[in-house]
């Protein structure tokens, strides 16, 4: 069924609003992926705070004009999925990377972060970013390790000092 002008304007406005609040965006080609797998991907995306949109290419180009993701416009060829990360910059990249591993026909075309276009081959730049909680845990582990190391070195120095004074 053909979309009317008002419907198209509403879709462009929705995608534009999603793009304005998103931290990063990933563009993928869904040709050859079954409907059941796509529905599972959508459910997983909702659970992870990723806004997944299947939009006509012309409407997607118009929706992304004036946003940080306008650099993705050249990728809109064929059946295109737009995935916006709302909570963590690497969420959409990680989600689609895992989905692409399980589905050979699913192809990631590229992504954008803070207005910078990133090739699909460099997907790991964003997909491997730790979440806020993971980064805090890594920082705490490093700090704890440093403190424990200082304590061990201090105790060893005291032991050496006592051995020297006893000798």
From Swiss-Prot:
Gene3D superfamilies listed in its UniProt record: 3.30.70.1730, 6.10.250.2350
Cross-referenced InterPro entries: Ribosomal_uL10, Ribosomal_uL10-like_sf, Ribosomal_uL10_bac, Ribosomal_uL10_bac_type, Ribosomal_uL10_CS_bac
GO biological process, one term: translation
UniProt keyword rRNA-binding present: yes
Keyword annotations from UniProtKB, A to Z: Ribonucleoprotein, Ribosomal protein, RNA-binding, rRNA-binding
UniProt family annotation: Belongs to the universal ribosomal protein uL10 family.
The protein's name in its UniProt record: Large ribosomal subunit protein uL10
């Amino acid at each position: 069924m053909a979309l009317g002008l008002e419907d198209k304007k509403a879709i462009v406005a929705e995608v534009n609003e999603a793009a304005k609040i998103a931290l990063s965006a990933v563009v993928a080609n869904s040709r050859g992926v079954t409907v059941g797998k796509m529905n599972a991907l959508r459910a997983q995306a909702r659970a992870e705070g990723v806004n997944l949109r299947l939009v006509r290419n012309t409407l997607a180009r118009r929706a992304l004009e004036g946003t940080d993701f306008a650099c993705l416009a050249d990728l809109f060829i064929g059946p295109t999925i737009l995935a916006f990360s709302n909570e963590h910059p690497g969420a959409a990249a990680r989600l689609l990377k895992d989905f692409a591993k399980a589905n050979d026909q699913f192809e990631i075309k590229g992504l954008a972060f803070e207005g910078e276009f990133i090739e699909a081959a460099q997907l790991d730049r964003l997909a491997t970013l730790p979440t806020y909680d993971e980064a805090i845990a890594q920082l705490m582990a490093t700090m704890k390790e440093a403190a424990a190391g200082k304590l061990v070195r201090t105790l060893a120095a005291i032991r050496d000092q006592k051995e020297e004074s006893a000798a």
